[in-house]
Amino acid sequence: MMVALLVLFTPFSFGKPVTYVIDPSHTFPAFEADHMGGLSLWRGKINSTSGEIILDKKNKTGSVNVVMEMLSIDFGHDEMNKRAKSDDMFDIEEFPQASYEGKLINFQDGVPTKVEGELTLHGITKNVDLEIKAFKCRLHPFKLREVCGADLRGNIMRDDFGIKYGKMLGFKMGVALRIGVEAIKK
């Protein structure tokens, strides 16, 4: 009986590719960007995300597909949120979504350490690779299904995506990406 329960509730799937649905209540693409040429850092996040992760542990492959709703951009400051959504910056009326598609690569000890992919932001698509700083799968204690989580890091130049606000005033264009994601087995 105990063996049957262990098999039934084993949180790891080793035999075939498994699809995980991104949990929007536990996934936050966050970023840090320069304010006024080094005066301070502004931090923000995207509050509304959706997508899937496919993980094939046996063959050490996988993919990521994430959609971010730019209306949900949040700096924790109403005026900055308004500015970020305007046509000066993200122009969310013209570009309501950003997306990221990538491949999980460089598996070590059974887990991926990098995502090689493309970010589409502000209508422009560029190669953006993400480093996976932490990755773990386990049995979700409430849903009794496998859940995987990761902490990812990367960097972009926002002017590469046509977002040049502040450049003429000396604002630095580099943006640090800090992404926390959790996804539940489908």
Label the predicted regions.
Residues 1-4:
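Sec-dependent signal peptide recognition
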Residues 14-186:
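Low-complexity, acidic/polar, glycine-enriched regions of mature
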